[in-house]
């Protein structure tokens, strides 16, 4: 690169400009008013990500800028329309073979950003779009930050979600900028904040419309060095010796309670932030780089990164061997909880007009109210303007007949689990909708081939299984039957992605994938209960293992009637190993459906209309369940044994699903279990976990359990074959370390 090194401030026609090669990511131009503009644009990529190979470019650009004697300020802005810098390219970690390699990688990032922080004239980050991870660390190194008031603009440090910590100074600069309590919250959760929230917490200095973002950033740079605003008194109090000791003690206890020790990055984040506050910046940066290097080599980080790469690769696949049809309008049959949720994500995330049909106007009103209420939360938190809520609400309409269905491209059916009713829905849509309209059933148990049995256009019938609550659960299963066309598959996957969902394509067999691996897990938990193990002990064992909730709690939340409805179908189609314990029927006969009717395995006190305590009462077991089941609760099994019994049933069934081509590959099986059930992410999913244990150990464990508890534990043929041939589900270079997760072995 070459650069004109002189500026004549009296002649505004002179402009210094870097002559950069076509592939340059960082380019510098200097305005007549002596403000330099550094534009970041990774050519060929949709978003900007930082790579190690860019370090020399950044250093050279900064050297060129510093050589301009009359330069008054710098503005860093993105050349992408909707993204600032989405983070660092985490594939760089794959090239690190030791903790020292990863440590050096972090130190290089720290060194480059230190040059920005020490730049002799003000450097301003003009932020529009995603400013995450390394992107936010770069912005933190700048002397000022201006961001756009736009829904696309979010700021965050999500490294903890990959089992890492911010490695380029984020753990040191953020606490000093916004205060230690706010910084710890952001770094430990990985949560993203929007523009107004970022301004309120002191993360950015101004929020402006996008069309004047650059102008305001330039004016900020011209203003010279400005005094840093004082932290709020609460944050100043927490930075003192007593406040700091109290805060870190509370944060550490809460973190340990939440992570159960399964996510080492959280503990290291607390240590590194504390190190910098207690011993100063140099010690903090050194601790940050060291911790980054060590965390990059942990099996937990490897597992979490594998999930990231898995979902990234899945998003690039259409699901079918054809191009999807364009989707302009969507229909939803049924305005209940599922139908209302599907309409919600279609309108608010996909931005598509959606027409709801329900036999009762009340159902339509409930569906509309659901979206109104969810958007209302965003309005109240200042994340959405009332006018935008109104605009999104106008995308949803309803009717008690098929008026308006003539021009929909896909209809999602969410009515009762009744085969004849669903077949009638297919016939109605084929009659009232357009010839190209796809019929997608949200069934959780009925075969799609049966639903399509009487269809005139069976190639346009498919399953689309959402999980409740629809707006929170990220997974959907796309279920083609034998006659479903590739175009229908691709179009359905495309709709799910527009709705913000992670979609896996699974075979049309009983239980599909998620419910099929969940059923034996729940059944085994029920057997532990019938063996006399207390309800709370069973749940705690699986929560300690890493699941977000225990299996008994999950059954209560889903609905005992719903959760057990699929069991007879699985028994009929797949055999007796799916049979629930016979005495478990008394739970349903007693009218217990779980939280939804206030009667389950736990007590659900009625909501009080009076004074609301800030802390909810601790959930209590309904001890009358023990009398109903005829058992005397007594904790006699170790937590590890309970967890082993339940999870081994799930692992065995997951392997069967792969062997029977229910799922297309181990990757989809891992994604389905993590996002559909809450399988511990730090284990990477059932197949990553089995690789870490080794097929031989899985088979040996299953055989021992079969000897002790019955033939339901007999290992499937695929696992036996893999154990004999010492095979893995993933290639060795993509597998977790052999010694990974020893606490779960």
From Swiss-Prot:
GO terms for cellular component: cytoplasm. Its main location: cytoplasm. Gene3D superfamilies: 1.10.1040.50, 2-enoyl-CoA Hydratase, Chain A, domain 1, NAD(P)-binding Rossmann-like Domain. InterPro entries: 3-OHacyl-CoA_DH_CS (IPR006180), 3-OHacyl-CoA_DH_NAD-bd (IPR006176), 3HC_DH_C (IPR006108), 6-PGluconate_DH-like_C_sf (IPR008927), ClpP/crotonase-like_dom_sf (IPR029045), Enoyl-CoA_hydra/iso (IPR001753), FA_oxidation_alpha_subunit (IPR050136), FadJ (IPR012802). It is found in: Cytoplasm. Its EC number is 4.2.1.17, 5.1.2.3, 1.1.1.35. Transmembrane segments: none annotated. This is Fatty acid oxidation complex subunit alpha.
């Amino acid at each position: 690169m070459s650069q004109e090194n002189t500026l004549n401030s009296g002649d505004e026609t002179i402009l210094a400009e870097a002559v950069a090669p076509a592939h340059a990511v960082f380019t510098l131009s200097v305005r007549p008013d002596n403000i330099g503009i550094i534009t970041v644009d990774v050519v060929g990529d949709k978003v900007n990500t930082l790579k190690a190979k860019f370090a020399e470019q950044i250093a050279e650009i900064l050297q060129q800028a510093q050589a301009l004697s009359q330069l008054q300020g710098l503005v860093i802005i993105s050349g992408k329309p909707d993204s600032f810098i989405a983070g660092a390219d985490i594939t760089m970690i794959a090239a690190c073979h030791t903790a020292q390699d990863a440590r050096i990688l972090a130190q290089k990032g720290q060194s480059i950003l230190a040059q920005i922080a020490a730049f002799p004239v003000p450097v301003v980050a003009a932020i529009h779009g995603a400013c995450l991870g390394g992107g936010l660390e770069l912005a933190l190194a700048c002397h000022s930050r201006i961001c756009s008031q736009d829904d696309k603009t979010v700021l965050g440090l999500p490294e903890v979600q990959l089992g890492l910590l911010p490695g380029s100074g984020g753990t040191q600069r953020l606490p000093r900028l916004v205060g230690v309590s706010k910084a710890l919250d952001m770094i430990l959760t990985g949560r993203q904040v929007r523009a107004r929230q970022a301004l309120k917490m002191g993360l950015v200095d101004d929020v402006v419309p996008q069309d004047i973002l650059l102008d305001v950033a330039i004016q900020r740079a011209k203003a010279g060095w400005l005094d840093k605003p004082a932290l709020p008194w609460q944050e100043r109090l927490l930075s003192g010796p007593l406040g700091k000791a109290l805060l870190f003690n509370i944060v550490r206890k809460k973190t340990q309670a939440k992570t159960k020790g399964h996510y080492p990055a959280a503990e290291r984040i607390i240590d590194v932030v504390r190190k910098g506050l207690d011993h100063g910046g140099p010690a903090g940066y050194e601790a940050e780089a060291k911790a980054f290097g060590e965390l990059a080599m942990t099996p937990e980080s490897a597992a979490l990164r594998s999930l990231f790469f898995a979902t990234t690769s899945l998003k690039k696949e259409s699901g079918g061997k054809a191009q999807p049809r364009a989707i302009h309008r969507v229909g939803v049959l049924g305005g209940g909880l599922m139908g209302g949720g599907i309409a919600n994500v279609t309108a608010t995330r996909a931005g598509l007009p959606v027409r709801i049909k329900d036999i009762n106007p009340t159902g339509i009103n409930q569906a509309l109210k659901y979206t109104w209420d969810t958007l209302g939360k965003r309005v109240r938190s200042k994340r959405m303007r009332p006018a935008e809520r109104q605009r999104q609400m106008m995308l949803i309409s309803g009717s008690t007949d098929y008026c308006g269905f003539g021009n929909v491209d896909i209809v999602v059916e969410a009515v009762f689990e009744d085969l004849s009713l669903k077949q009638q829905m297919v016939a109605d849509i084929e009659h009232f909708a357009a010839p190209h309209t796809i019929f997608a059933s949200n069934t959780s148990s009925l075969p799609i081939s049966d639903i399509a049995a009487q269809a005139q256009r069976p190639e346009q019938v498919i399953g689309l299984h959402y999980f409740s609550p629809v707006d929170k659960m990220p997974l959907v299963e796309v279920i083609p039957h034998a006659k479903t066309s590739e175009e229908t598959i691709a179009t359905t996957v495309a709709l799910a992605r527009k709705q913000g969902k992670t979609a896996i394509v699974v075979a049309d067999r009983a239980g599909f994938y998620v419910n099929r691996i969940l059923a034996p897990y729940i059944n085994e938990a029920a057997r532990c209960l019938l063996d006399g193990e207390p309800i709370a002990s069973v749940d705690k064992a699986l929560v300690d293992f890493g699941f977000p909730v225990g299996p008994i709690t999950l059954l209560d939340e889903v609905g005992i009637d719903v959760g057990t409805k699929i069991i007879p179908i699985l028994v009929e189609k797949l055999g007796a190993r799916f049979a629930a314990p016979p005495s478990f029927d008394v739970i349903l006969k007693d009218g217990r459906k779980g939280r939804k009717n206030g009667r389950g395995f736990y007590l659900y006190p009625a909501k009080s209309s009076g004074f609301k305590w800030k802390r909810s009462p601790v959930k209590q077991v309904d001890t009358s369940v023990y009398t109903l089941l005829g058992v005397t609760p007594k904790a006699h099994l170790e937590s590890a044994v309970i967890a082993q019994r339940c999870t081994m049933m799930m692992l065995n069934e997951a392997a069967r699903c792969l062997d029977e081509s229910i799922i297309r590959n181990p990757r989809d099986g891992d994604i389905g279990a993590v996002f559909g059930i809450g399988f511990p992410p730090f284990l990477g999913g059932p197949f990553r976990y089995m690789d870490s244990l080794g097929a031989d150990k899985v088979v040996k464990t299953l055989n021992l359990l079969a000897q002790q508890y019955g033939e339901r534990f007999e290992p499937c043929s695929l696992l036996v074959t893999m154990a004999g041939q010492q095979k893995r589900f993933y290639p060795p270079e993509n597998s977790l370390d052999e010694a990974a997760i020893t606490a779960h072995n």
